[in-house]
Amino acid sequence: MCSSDLPLAGALTVNIGDMVQVWSNDRYPAPLHRAFVHADEDRFSVPFFFNPAYSTDYAPLPSAIDARNPPRYRPINWREFRARRAAGDYAHAGEYAEISQYAI
């Protein structure tokens, strides 16, 4: 980890997640989730998750692609993605789903 990866003191850190990375066609990369716990300091987390309907296919937004920036992901079905992610997270019954598996 380099010093530019560390949040500023008192800053609010927002983990945008994989969906925004796909929507933005990699303009806004999702960071690796990692938390550092310090025994002598308080740490507050307020998770908020936005999930589309399971029938949703998400892909780079039209405003994020052009002739110089073609789509970097094929459409990702949310139900399929979440099922694969859950299998990797909880059941350990398969490959952990990553957006890189949908890269073009």
Q: Which residues fall in each region the model found?
A:
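C-terminal flanking tails of non-heme Fe-dependent oxygenases
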Residues: 4-104
